[in-house]
Structures are given as structure tokens and as C-alpha cells.
Curated annotation (Swiss-Prot):
Residue ranges of the region described as Disordered: 32-67
Family listed: Belongs to the complex I NDUFV3 subunit family.
Subunit structure: Complex I is composed of 45 different subunits. This is a component of the flavoprotein-sulfur (FP) fragment of the enzyme.
Transit peptide feature, positions: 1-35
Subcellular location: Mitochondrion inner membrane
Native species: Rattus norvegicus
Main location: mitochondrion
One of the GO biological process terms: mitochondrial ATP synthesis coupled electron transport
Modification sites for Phosphoserine: 105
Protein name as catalogued: NADH dehydrogenase [ubiquinone] flavoprotein 3, mitochondrial
Primary role: Accessory subunit of the mitochondrial membrane respiratory chain NADH dehydrogenase (Complex I), that is believed not to be involved in catalysis. Complex I functions in the transfer of electrons from NADH to the respiratory chain. The immediate electron acceptor for the enzyme is believed to be ubiquinone. May be the terminally assembled subunit of Complex I.
Amino acid sequence: MAVSLLLRGGRIRALKAALLEAKVFRGELASTVPLSTESENNKKAAGPTSKTESVFKEPTLVPESSDTTTYKNLQHHEYNAFTFLDLNLDLSKFRLPQPSSGRESPRH
């Protein structure tokens, strides 16, 4: 909703809509947070009630080893001072000419 207001009317309407949405979300979250913590405490105290809950436990995740000494995808980090100019030159053959009205532009 805020995005459509930003596109239609401007920043003030979008800001008002975002603030109103934030108040709505804040109100919803404030009412559900105590309920969710109470239910988690009750489940832990009661334990699994059926056989299926005990069978389908989440597997423990093994942390992946991360090697930070080498970066595998170097194509994004090979920039230099002429990178933009090189790309501009490469893509210039695909550009269309600018449209003109047929009149000469005023020279100041």
C-alpha cells in the first residue's frame, strides 16, 4: 500500500501510510508475543504428547567450515579505474540514437 501511495501521491502520503502500518503491526505483535512465549513454555514442560512429535524432531545442523582466505567468485571484484569506461565502450554498439524533433537545438 505504501508503495502505491508513493508512486501516486508523493512522499507525505507514503510516510503517513507507512507509519499507520507500523502502528498496526506493532499492535498485532504486542498481543501475540506473550501468547507465543507461554505456549512454548507449556510445551517444554509437558513434553511430547504423541508418538509423531517425538519421531519428527529437527536434525541438528553441523556448522559449515568457511574459508575466508580465498574468494571463490572473483568476477565481481575485479574493478579498476577504467571498468566503467570499458563497459561503456562495449555496450555503445547496442545503443539506439537519441530521437530528434528535426529542429536544431538552441546554442547559447
